Amino acid sequence: MGKYFGTDGVRGEANVELTPELAFKLGRFGGYVLSQHETERPRVFVARDTRISGEMLEAALIAGLLSVGIEVYKLGVLATPGVSYLVRTEKASAGVMISASHNPALDNGIKFFGSDGFKLADEQELEIEALLDAKKDLLPRPSAEGLGALVDYPEGLRKYERFLVTTGADLDGLKIALDTANGAASVSARNVFLDLNADITVIGENPNGLNINDGIGSTHPEKLQELMTETASDIGLAFDGDSDRLIAVDENGAIVDGDKIMFIIGKYLSEKGLLAKNTIVTTVMSNLGFHKALDSCGIHKKVTAVGDRYVVEEMRQFGYNLGGEQSGHVIIMDYNTTGDGQLTAVQLTKIMKETGKTLSELASEVTIYPQKLVNIRVDNSMKERAMEVPAIAEVIAQMEGEMAGNGRILVRPSGTEPLLRVMAEAPSNEEVDYYVDTIAAVVRAEIGLD
């Protein structure tokens, strides 16, 4: 991660950290870096979610893009994966999404996509950061016909919706509850599932700029669970603010997280011979029960660091077509280049329809182990070297020995804070408490600051 770019673009409190001035510079410098080798006038697609700060940042970002001669196609409110899809299929030079995903309304972010629909490589982000930190802006300043033009492009939303529908099945007879988080999915999810002939009920469909992700959506599925009870729906589908995540709820009101969703889709593809290298890519946070379920089906897995960015890198490098995270980011590379909540929802409901199974039946093969995570404040200089402390290494080895393969321990540094995270999974809550508390006590005694 660089000075400005984190693992998912540039983020911060809108108008405080992520200011219009910074958005203008990101548009100007980012647009230049991504289009400097174009032989024709470059085109960049820009979209946003429903945050109140979105239009402010959109205006500033677009001004920056126009100032270096880029033609900007303004998509308005659209899901992040919709930008990725349109950039790739319409052969644009780049795409930009203004969103802070599942974060609250006061935050916002700016995320770039290259012409291939993938997030930027580290080298491209560093090139943009170098221009941001330069003492003087030496980029060209065209005038008159050299300036970029702005094109309103509402057709982009319709094209993305039609794409989603083409990947699905006729859902006649399936009753679906949707939670669009008062975010980007609020303009599209209803249309997609109506076009698929589903019987739908929708909440979180009335954004006011401030209520995105506010007690609703994939990080707060409680309201969707209540709606499932009220409507006796077959499945509930909850998206986050920019609709790159999906969390589902089964007909009994139980949460079906990213691990279970990946398993359901992966098993379906594997049985059809369509799972590339019969492998799913996941992160170190995926539950041990997910791994055991894959083993029982003969499906292989590759494990990366936390973050859908690293999952996608692994998939691209080795040619896998399914990966994701426990949090609900699911990447189905046969269709799109980034996590896509609505695409995942369409595939999940298609599998229900084709198999005739309920969501609880499809998810029942994954037994989620109890999990506990404790954050311990440590000095930044020590969080990367904790495993070098003999007492810490010894207690972890001791706990792993007691588990005898029927559990998992993960001790890792936070990527953004002076914290060491201690996580364990085991068959019972009592065992999890024992493993985590024992390790945490040693960590606090050796390097803890509290």
From Swiss-Prot:
EC numbers on record: 5.4.2.10
Post-translational modifications: Activated by phosphorylation.
Similarity comment: family membership: Belongs to the phosphohexose mutase family.
Cofactor note: Binds 1 Mg(2+) ion per subunit.
Active site: 101
Gene Ontology MF terms: magnesium ion binding; phosphoglucosamine mutase activity; phosphomannomutase activity
UniProt cross-references to InterPro entries, sorted A to Z: A-D-PHexomutase_a/b/a-I, A-D-PHexomutase_a/b/a-I/II/III, A-D-PHexomutase_a/b/a-II, A-D-PHexomutase_a/b/a-III, A-D-PHexomutase_C, A-D-PHexomutase_C_sf, A-D-PHexomutase_CS, Alpha-D-phosphohexomutase_SF
Described purpose of this protein according to its UniProt entry: Catalyzes the conversion of glucosamine-6-phosphate to glucosamine-1-phosphate.
Taxonomic superkingdom: Bacteria
The protein's required cofactors: Mg(2+)
The protein, known as: Phosphoglucosamine mutase
Name of a matching Pfam family: PGM_PMM_II
One of the GO BP terms on file: UDP-N-acetylglucosamine biosynthetic process
Keyword Phosphoprotein: yes
Catalytic activity from the UniProt record: alpha-D-glucosamine 1-phosphate = D-glucosamine 6-phosphate
Record bears the keyword Isomerase: yes
Binding site for Mg(2+): 101, 240, 242, 244
Modified residues (Phosphoserine): 101
One GO cellular component term noted in the UniProt record for this chain: cytosol
Keyword entries, A-Z: Isomerase, Magnesium, Metal-binding, Phosphoprotein
